[in-house]
Every structure is written in structure tokens, then in C-alpha cells.
């Protein structure tokens, strides 16, 4: 299975996020899942790429020209797919992937989560987004989604489009279930 991972490219974040991300990368490789990601060489993006490669897995990087020109491309990609911008990257990652996992991240990660989820809600695809809620990182987003649903701003149950995993065991069940 091809699992797209959305995550932070920031290096200055909670060190536990790196440890948990390494465990996920190891699990992906050992279970034959390919990594599809933004192809950047910093932060959790770099961490997940290195972990997958260290355990014999395959990496597919969807790399915008701005990242490449800045010398920030992950150096050990098995496949590099170049694109013009972040919108193209999301479209290409959607086409390349079977499901999506969101690790801790910022504005870019939120954009990716909600772009994929919105496309699912109106029927463009039926691929799930899983929030990997390590250390409760996504709790405020989960509360926001619940609040929006309570106010009838979301049609149906948002959990039909976005799942939540609090640990690797839950994540594995959702990915393989």
C-alpha cells in the first residue's frame, strides 16, 4: 500500500515526535508500505524518509521546484516526482496514494488534511485521512471538527472522512483495516 504522510518540515519541535515518527517509518517498511511524502530533507519529513529507508522501504517524494531549487530535497528518494507548486503536490500525492496519515505539522499540514478531506466529502475520491494524534497533538482540531459538526457546518459525520489514531497499534489497524 502507498501511504502518504503529511507532516512538519520544522526541526525545532518536540523530540518525542521524531521518536514516534521513526517507529511509524519502521512499521511502514517492515509491512511493505511505500511512503509518499513531500520529499523534503528536514523535520519530520526527513525523519520519516530516513526511517523507511533504514528498514528497507521505498520512498516516493513529490517535490515542488521551490524545494528542489533551495537544496531541500530528501537525498534518498527511490522515485522523485517533480511539480510546480503546493497545489500540484497535493494533487499528485492524492493520485499516488491509497490513504493519508497526518503527523504533527503546521499550516501546510492543515491545508493538506482539509484539501484531501474536502475532496472526499464531495465524492472526488474515497481515501481516508488519519490524524496520528501523538501526544494529543490533534486534540484541538478534533474539538474544532466536533464543534463544527454540532453547529451543522459539516454534513454527515466527519469521522467518515477523517479517522484518529492515538498510537501505532491503532494506526496500523486503521491502515490495514
Residue ranges and their predicted role:
Residues 59, 124-127:
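Short, structured loop/turn "capping" segments at alpha-beta junctions
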Amino acid at each position: 500500500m502507498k501511504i502518504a504522510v503529511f507532516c512538519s518540515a520544522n526541526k525545532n519541535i518536540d523530540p518525542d515526535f521524531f521518536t514516534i515518527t521513526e517507529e511509524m517509518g519502521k512499521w511502514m517498511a517492515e509491512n511493505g508500505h511505500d511512503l509518499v511524502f513531500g520529499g523534503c530533507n528536514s523535520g519530520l519529513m526527513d525523519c520519516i524518509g530516513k526511517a523507511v529507508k533504514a528498514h528497507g522501504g521505498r520512498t516516493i517524494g513529490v517535490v515542488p521546484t521551490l524545494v528542489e531549487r533551495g537544496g531541500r530535497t530528501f537525498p534518498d528518494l527511490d522515485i522523485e516526482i517533480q511539480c510546480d507548486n503546493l497545489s500540484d503536490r497535493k494533487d499528485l500525492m492524492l493520485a499516488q496514494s491509497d490513504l493519508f496519515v497526518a503527523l504533527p505539522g503546521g499550516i501546510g499540514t492543515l491545508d493538506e488534511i482539509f484539501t484531501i478531506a474536502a475532496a472526499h466529502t464531495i465524492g472526488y475520491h474515497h481515501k481516508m485521512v488519519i490524524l496520528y494524534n501523538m501526544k494529543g497533538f490533534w486534540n484541538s482540531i478534533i474539538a474544532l471538527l466536533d464543534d463544527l459538526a454540532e453547529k451543522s457546518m459539516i454534513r454527515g459525520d466527519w469521522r467518515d472522512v477523517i479517522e484518529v489514531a492515538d498510537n501505532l497499534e491503532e494506526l496500523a489497524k486503521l491502515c490495514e483495516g
